[in-house]
UniProtKB/Swiss-Prot annotation:
Keywords per UniProt: Cell membrane, Coiled coil, Glycoprotein, GPI-anchor, Isopeptide bond, Lipoprotein, Membrane, Phosphoprotein, Ubl conjugation
Function: Binds to regulatory subunit (RII) of protein kinase A. May be involved in establishing polarity in signaling systems or in integrating PKA-RII isoforms with downstream effectors to capture, amplify and focus diffuse, trans-cellular signals carried by cAMP. Binds to and modulates the structure of the actin cytoskeleton.
TM stretches of this protein: none
Gene Ontology MF annotations: protein kinase A binding
Name recorded for this polypeptide: PALM2-AKAP2 fusion protein
Gene: PALM2AKAP2
UniProt feature, compositional bias: Polar residues: 179-189, 522-531, 566-579, 633-643, 745-763, 976-990
Low complexity: bias regions: 380-392, 506-521
Amino acid sequence: MAEAELHKERLQAIAEKRKRQTEIEGKRQQLDEQILLLQHSKSKVLREKWLLQGIPAGTAEEEEARRRQSEEDEFRVKQLEDNIQRLEQEIQTLESEESQISAKEQIILEKLKETEKSFKDFQKGFSSTDGDAVNYISSQLPDLPILCSRTAEPSPGQDGTSRAAGVGWENVLLKEGESASNATETSGPDMTIKKPPQLSEDDIWLKSEGDNYSATLLEPAASSLSPDHKNMEIEVSVAECKSVPGITSTPHPMDHPSAFYSPPHNGLLTDHHESLDNDVAREIRYLDEVLEANCCDSAVDGTYNGTSSPEPGAVVLVGGLSPPVHEATQPEPTERTASRQAPPHIELSNSSPDPMAEAERTNGHSPSQPRDALGDSLQVPVSPSSTTSSRCSSRDGEFTLTTLKKEAKFELRAFHEDKKPSKLFEDDEHEKEQYCIRKVRPSEEMLELEKERRELIRSQAVKKNPGIAAKWWNPPQEKTIEEQLDEEHLESHKKYKERKERRAQQEQLLLQKQLQQQQQQPPSQLCTAPASSHERASMIDKAKEDIVTEQIDFSAARKQFQLMENSRQAVAKGQSTPRLFSIKPFYRPLGSVNSDKPLTNPRPPSVGGPPEDSGASAAKGQKSPGALETPSAAGSQGNTASQGKEGPYSEPSKRGPLSKLWAEDGEFTSARAVLTVVKDDDHGILDQFSRSVNVSLTQEELDSGLDELSVRSQDTTVLETLSNDFSMDNISDSGASNETTNALQENSLADFSLPQTPQTDNPSEGRGEGVSKSFSDHGFYSPSSTLGDSPLVDDPLEYQAGLLVQNAIQQAIAEQVDKAVSKTSRDGAEQQGPEATVEEAEAAAFGSEKPQSMFEPPQVSSPVQEKRDVLPKILPAEDRALRERGPPQPLPAVQPSGPINMEETRPEGSYFSKYSEAAELRSTASLLATQESDVMVGPFKLRSRKQRTLSMIEEEIRAAQEREEELKRQRQVLQSTQSPRTKNAPSLPSRTCYKTAPGKIEKVKPPPSPTTEGPSLQPDLAPEEAAGTQRPKNLMQTLMEDYETHKSKRRERMDDSSYTSKLLSCKVTSEVLEATRVNRRKSALALRWEAGIYANQEEEDNE
């Protein structure tokens, strides 16, 4: 059925349907009205009946009138009901009609769709039915005046155009998704390049493209055809196939093109729809036969300048897998050019392994061409007058010429395809990867644009909010920072600015250097393209070079700058922010590990040093990376000394949280000084150096055997915060007198930054000697001498590290010597009060340190060299070292008899105060941890005033406590020999240091009476005494021993830091309570205190 008729019928159907629909709508409206009327009438009738019921009978006329009225009403109701029924039926019929019409319309629509099926689908169908079908394009040559009979064997070389063979062209005739046509004997895809009918510029493009093709191997020209284009070609070809119904060997007269010419139908062949199948199938079959025939023999027979004339109607494309194809456009005989009106459609075909000649040749005898022109040169000049390009595929000298004439179907082409051939710049494809060219506007233009943009925004804002204009046009006069600051701050602000400028200048210089280096490297290295591209793009290169080098300079310069930051320690030294001194036995530095690593790792371990065991905790005798180990047994003390200077200073973060700063063994004592350098420039995370000078693990840890336990688990945050805080103090106080800092740091740092655990004060015989020996063997010079040496040390960092290590070792030596000396002289000393000893020792240590601290103030200005941190570390260390005297024996089994009571008693005060300090610190640290972020903000560190005050108060309190304790101890010793009758007399709990809730400063209750106090403790303590001595232990001792036993049992469970800290505080409290409970008479204060403790702690004790 003709398409037009179908359209007409469909339109009629649609009109009918519309008509029915309007009718239905009208009827529905009527129906609704009728229904309303009916309801109204019914209700009216009902109402009247109801009203009339109670009315007394009137005259006969009235009765008659009423009856008539009611009848009328009833009739109307009935009428309405009939109407409604009728309307409903009509609507029903109309709807059924409408549905029939719409069904009919649907059928018509489907028929139309069938006729409108794209010819691509037909083509698909045909090619799939024919197993070996090739996609063909047969084209009309509408007005070619010359007639020639077609010869079965065309001459391949005819138009002199040759194509260098290209491998495996993509099939262009099929849409991208479809497979390339597979001819059985010729499995090569075809390529069509089409020219739009009237566009001369397209001719030119084709010609120039021919040149390009011959110049370089091209990708399949498929890219030059858009999918629409391809589909269009297929449709066209099918249309034309149909219009050339049979292709026979007899020539068709070209004078009568109408015989084959079918006018374009916009892709729909309405009239010939039915016959299309047969015609197309016939043509395809015929062409296949021709191809098979040609495939065998034509290649041999074809001459280069034979005079064969094609059948004008159809052209066969044969493709095969073949060597690369180049196309060249070729001038054609002028007689043809003149007579031709529609530019031809050009087909590319790959020659099959036995190249095939075309089944048809376009009219005319092509001029004979010498073989060499056709052969390898592959490029023939294009004559400007020629409107046709013919392509030949050459393989081993045999050519297949394909010239196709195409009738104009331009309405189907993709409109932009002619203007923008996608192949135009294909040759430069490899260059694209080489260059990245960005369009950058000149800065003036940008400024201009920005200005305009702002103006626009302003104008809009002013429109919306006129009040805003006043602000803009009369901005408030802002004061500069300089005006706002007072003199003190102004000065520091200026200094800060100067520093900033200096730094910026240095960075600029660096960048310039880098840029110069970059420019010296020829940019061509960076963007070397293949030589061919260089030849082509030599001009472009000149233009591109600037852009490219600029980009490369920037990114490369940045990279190099970053790299240099690592190596540039010396340069950056002066500008870094103050550094932290953190005591870090077991926690990571604040900065990320990575921030430390690049800087600290480069230090090579000294050759002689013992092997490093970086991951594990420093087990006895093993050296953890930063630790100076002094294996006195191994006898490598000298080594260690050198190592002290050059050894690897690895950051604590690297050596893992478990490492101990003192690994102690019978034979070894290793002190560790860890110098952690965090490069501020790179990672502004930490201060320039966070040095952890961890000399001597907290003595408590060693003594109490808590090493792994508490080192591992005590809240690291506490330490971190505190150490940072105190290091801040240190820095800010750097100008202050050493004594002040020392006083500050002495207890607070020691106690703060190290895990606080009780320590038995039993001297360890072997250890004292070992330590002192190994350290004294080191032969470290005094800090001041080292400072003197400093110029000799090439790298300031190494110098710092050396100082650090020496200090560590020196201090350890001092401790050990001190310990050894004090062992002998201690009884007497402690009679005078341990406080004295502690202070003496500290004084002694400070004596050794003072030269150093004297040295420091000049260095403080460059934070990198600031050596201050050694003080805090050493102070705590000494503090601890003095207290350190015991090995980690859970019970004091090795106590030598003799006046050890003195020694034991000494730690009592410090032991307890240490506990409360630990608690206090935990609480303050937890506060501090939250504040820390503020503390570290900006280039300056602020130390918390609260912290400082607290530490001073604690010191005073502790000093007082210790003095009291000393007196008590003396009294106790005197009383210990008194009559056994007093044994049961409980003394007041005055001697106990009350463990208060964390953060509260402990109170020491002075003993009301010396008599009751001391002896009362002896009975309970005596049973616990170890074999060495029958002397009574004081409360402190007992508690510590309890603690030790308890701890050794539960060491495994201690890893959780919160658990540990809780346990420490709870345990101590409970033990204090137990000890207190022994005493019969308790002061009101004691009772109250105990009650409070019980209330707070009982649950925890039960854990």
